[in-house]
Amino acid sequence: MYAYDPGNPREFIDGQVYAVGFTWDKDNDPAFPPDSNGAVSVLVFDSFKGKPTWASVGPFLSQYAKLYPFMDSLFPPGLGDPQVYQKNIRAFESVLGLPIEDPRYMPVTRDMSRDKRKVLLAWIKAGAPG
């Protein structure tokens, strides 16, 4: 299976989700009735070529603040404020730098593209300038 940049169809959320159906030769065997739930969800991310500046990362971090308002209670005044990252550089570097398989990986929903994560980490490593 191959996937290509979907071109940001959902604007504020990375990528596009596709359901891919499949069958196998046992589907014709009465002992193995077809399963109508036989599908694989595939998340294909759009590319992101922003620079490691607040102007580039701010819009998608503000979207995360809207999607996950609970995080604002952990980091007042909220994820949409660059000072939050400036004050918590080590914490954000550690969770954003983990392998995606790690349960502590952020965002926990695994819905941030590799490109945006790379730019975000570069911005944080630069001191999260506002």
Give the ranges of each region predicted by the language model.
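Aromatic- and Gly/Pro-enriched helix-to-coil junctions and flexible linker segments
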Residues: 2-130
